[in-house]
Amino acid sequence: LKNKDFGFPKYKCKSNPVQSYTTNNQNTIYIKDSYIKLPKLKSLVKIKLHKKIKGIIKSVTISKNSLDHYFVSILCEEEIEELPKTNKNIGIDLGIKEFATMSDCTKVENLKLSKEYEKKLKREQRKLSRRCKLAKDSDKKLSDSKNYQKQKKKVAKIHNKIRNKRKDFVNKLSTKIINNHDIICIEDLNIKGMLKNHKLAKSISDVSWSEFVRQLEYKANWYGRKIIKVPTFYPSSKTCSSCGNIKETLTLSERIYHCECCGLEIDRDYNASINILRKGLEILREEKVS
């Protein structure tokens, strides 16, 4: 977002690292070449357009992140065509080691971004703490300390990189699943409850299950796909996908499911994904009957 004739927007809440405001289109917003016309601004604003705008512009949101990068998000109204039928359905078991294990034998590795950037982030955060202390010892406001503000941006840059990588991963994976399947069955995970487990909380936050499910749901709604959520307490991991026997004693450390009734040996998560698909289709049949 660039224009030499006027300054950048000023936001009321400076403490929030991500700041934004929304303005509705009253025939005052339009895009021409690499410029956008915004309400109350006399001049056009130069932008980097990431994709072609389709439909009728309803509103725009101007936002600024912690790195002082400005963005314009454009809300448009358009008719979206449903995707052609694939005659393929899939069950998805979400996990920590593997982000997703699917009933077609596909495994998607977790990015483990927090672990990848952990050392670098801790190092830069320690520097930030030291510069905070130096500023306070010198009776300086943090907003007036150039060294503190410079280091603060370094930390923000790492967080921004993690956030962008995670967002890109979830977007591409959810789009691929929606494009290739008519019915997607997934567990209705109690993520808030799972976060209470302090040993797993960090890993669960890192994998972005909630955002993945959110994207699956809105894309399914757009493109005529069906999302079926299997109840939270359905024993997908403990149930044998071959004979239906429930193994009550299954522990988290057992990665291979061994059925004591029929002798089936199968990857634990793959077994769960088959059960999730089966249960989801059962729920769908019951919905149609009722």
Question: Where does each model-flagged region fall?
Answer:
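Nucleic-acid substrate recognition interfaces
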Residues: 1-290
